[in-house]
UniProtKB/Swiss-Prot annotation:
Coiled coil: none annotated. HAMAP family: UPF0305. Belongs to the UPF0305 family. This is UPF0305 protein MMP0665. InterPro entries: DUF2115. Pfam families: DUF2115.
Length: 162
């Protein structure tokens, strides 16, 4: 699929994410992160719900003409979709969360080529993504190599490569 066509689809989807979806997604994520340390959970949720709405707004404000037109492998799009559908628990708010995440993550991976987390996100141990000379380095890139992680699709390199 051509990137402009895929972007057009994502832009359409971005208008389907309502304020109620954002609220439901937040409740969902808070429940899904129940057993994480409170300070980590609080910071993660704050970063997530600052970053993802900003990216949604970016998608809505961007035109198709601003997107470089290149081929995206349909199989890669399907792989990301399947991975996103397998993440998290199946509780109330899941649909709203998926709607938000699918739109934003696909944009970040295939169109904008930016990290999947905000640069302000603090990971366990207090580390965060570092940007240096146009490259991004993540402290958990290689630590999250399980079949439920989406790290393999992220543009970030491992922090140890810095």
């Amino acid at each position: 699929m051509k990137s402009r066509k895929f972007f057009s689809k994502l832009k359409e989807e971005s208008y389907d994410v309502s304020i109620f979806d954002l609220m439901n997604a937040k409740v969902y994520l808070e429940k899904d992160m129940t057993y994480l340390p409170q300070d980590y959970k609080k910071g993660y949720i704050e970063d997530f719900f600052t970053f993802f709405p900003e990216v949604l707004k970016e998608i809505k404000n961007k035109t198709e003409e601003e997107i470089e037109d290149f081929e995206i492998e349909d199989e890669e799009i399907k792989r990301v979709e399947l991975r996103l559908c397998s993440m998290g628990s199946k509780q109330t708010g899941r649909e709203s969360y998926e709607k938000l995440v699918k739109t934003v993550i696909n944009y970040l991976i295939f169109i904008n080529e930016r990290p999947l987390h905000a640069l302000t996100t603090r990971f366990p141990g207090g580390k965060q993504i570092i940007e240096k000379n146009g490259n991004y380095y993540c402290p958990i890139k290689n630590a999250q190599s399980n079949e439920l992680s989406i790290c393999e699709f992220c543009i970030c390199k491992d922090l140890n490569e810095l």
